[in-house]
Regions:
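Acidic/polar low-complexity segments with low predicted structural confidence
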Residues: 1-61
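Short hinge/gating elements
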Residues: 4-17, 68-73, 108-110, 126-127
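Von Willebrand factor
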Residues: 28, 57-116, 118-160, 170-171, 210, ...
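Flexible beta-alpha connector loops of hexameric P-loop NTPases
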Residues: 76, 127-136, 177-183
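Switch/connector loops and helix/strand junctions flanking conserved nucleotide-binding motifs
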Residues: 107-113, 154, 170-175, 212-217, ...
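Von Willebrand factor type A / integrin I
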Residues: 146-159, 180-285
Length: 285
């Protein structure tokens, strides 16, 4: 009566020990329907052929797409993302997950790795990324969605998750308006965020450049981060800048603190785990 299969019950089948899980209630209902219940003795007459089992859904595989911003402010966190992938390799391999990587650098986002089981190649690509000024955020988000759609077409039962590490200062800018949110790069990013909700693709956004706790004081990148979270139905991890370091080393990215690393690990593990269980509540509606 023990089976290694996990997942939700999807179909009643003939019970086979080791192949499926015994369904006691369904067995009794079937027996009663076949006249195997005696009212006088209040007993069922059940044989081996009458046993009903549950066929389980196969464990869901996950397609994880990483969006990596390689500006000065976010580049110090690239190593953290590579270490997280390495630490979860066994878990990913057990579930036959795929990981893809998109670099937010240059005029257009660059697809460095299509979703693959070769996690070492992905971490190697991550660690090879160099600092680059431009951040084509909207293009990267759209390419991540295209990756997910293609993978869902190939594996209809698979789950998905996009993790974006970015300071949310999209480019290029026209500089024709005093309000950054009138810039095409900002408008297109918000439009791309709405597509995540429409497609029911969960998004974990990690912004390591927050300076303000009050929304009224937000810089444009902080405002855009909040807008992406709101419009996509995803989750935002705000990591606050070490202002003392920023003032003494203005040209360098601020290295992540131990607390920052723990928050990133916790957020990634939570989102990956929730997708494994097929929990779509955060992006419903």
């Amino acid at each position: 009566m023990v089976t290694e299969r996990s997942g939700r019950n999807v179909k009643e089948v003939r019970y086979q020990p080791g192949e499926n899980t015994l369904a006691p209630v369904q067995t009794l209902i079937k027996a009663a329907g076949q006249g195997r219940y005696e009212f006088s003795s209040r007993r069922f007459s059940i044989g081996g052929r009458d046993l009903v089992g549950w066929e389980k859904a196969e464990r869901q595989s996950l397609t994880l797409v990483l969006l990596a911003d390689v500006s000065h402010s976010t580049h110090p966190y690239i190593n953290v993302m590579a270490e997280i992938i390495n630490s979860l390799t066994g878990y990913f391999r057990m579930n036959k997950d795929r990981i893809g990587l998109i670099s937010l650098s240059g005029a257009q986002a660059q697809i460095l790795n299509h979703p693959t089981h070769n996690y070492r190649v992905v971490t190697k690509s991550l660690l090879s990324l160099a600092v680059h000024g431009q951040t084509p955020l909207a293009d990267g988000m759209q390419k991540a969605l295209a990756m997910i759609r293609l993978q869902k077409h190939r594996s209809p039962g698979s789950s998905s998750l996009v993790i974006a590490l970015t300071d949310c200062y999209p480019e290029p800018l026209t500089l024709h308006s005093p309000d950054p949110f009138d810039e095409p790069a900002y408008r297109e990013t918000v439009r791309a965020a709405k597509l995540f909700r429409k497609d029911k693709v969960p998004l974990l956004l990690i912004n390591p450049t927050f300076s303000h706790h009050q929304e009224k004081d937000y810089f444009p990148g902080e405002k855009l981060s909040a807008a992406i979270e709101r419009e996509s139905g995803g989750r935002l991890i705000k990591l606050y800048r070490n202002m003392e370091f920023a003032q003494t080393q203005p040209s360098q990215g601020i290295p992540p603190s131990h607390r920052d690393i723990l928050r990133i690990i916790s957020g990634v593990e939570e989102m990956v785990g929730s997708r494994r269980l097929g929990e779509d509540r955060r992006i419903a509606g």
